[in-house]
């Protein structure tokens, strides 16, 4: 019998850039490639990008240590410069390990932007995330922030 472990986390960042600029880092394929392309040593196998409600984004490849990951996302709700809601499935070495929903909220604050990312994950069939999803998402959001400079 399969098992499910539920988990959630929230990440908050403040940047000096306007919400429109931060939103474009998600909405524009070239801008997103600067921060969402895998860690150093990542060998990309597949990538697609269709940023619209109902659109799909995928990224798969092999990490430096040999692990193969696949991200398969569907955008559920997009309010330009304010909100992005998406759900996604992650595979690790060909095995489905999780199904998640995430919401990114962008709010003007002190002449810049407050980003709040909240994610709810269902970790499947004995996969022990041990905080790696939150760690990886923090790394991605930090990389996004650097790409804005």
What are these regions (language model features)?
Residues 27, 141-149:
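Short amphipathic alpha-helical signal-transduction/dimerization elements
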Residues 1-43:
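Hydrophobic ligand-binding cavity/cleft-lining segments
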Residues 22, 32, 57, 75, ...:
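Hydrophobic pocket/interface hotspot
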């Amino acid at each position: 019998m399969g098992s499910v472990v539920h988990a959630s986390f929230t990440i908050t960042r403040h940047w000096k850039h306007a919400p429109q600029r931060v939103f474009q880092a998600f909405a524009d394929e070239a801008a997103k490639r600067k921060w969402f392309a895998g860690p150093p040593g990542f060998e990309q196998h597949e990538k697609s990008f269709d940023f619209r409600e109902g659109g799909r984004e995928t990224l798969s490849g092999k990490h430096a240590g040999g692990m193969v990951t696949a991200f398969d996302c569907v955008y559920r709700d997009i309010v330009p410069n304010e909100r992005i809601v998406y759900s996604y499935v992650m595979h690790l070495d060909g095995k489905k390990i999780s199904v998640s929903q995430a919401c990114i909220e962008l709010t003007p604050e002190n002449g810049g932007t407050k980003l709040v990312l909240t994610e709810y994950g269902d970790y499947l069939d004995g996969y022990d995330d041990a905080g790696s999803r939150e760690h990886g998402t923090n790394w991605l959001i930090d990389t996004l922030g650097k790409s804005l400079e």
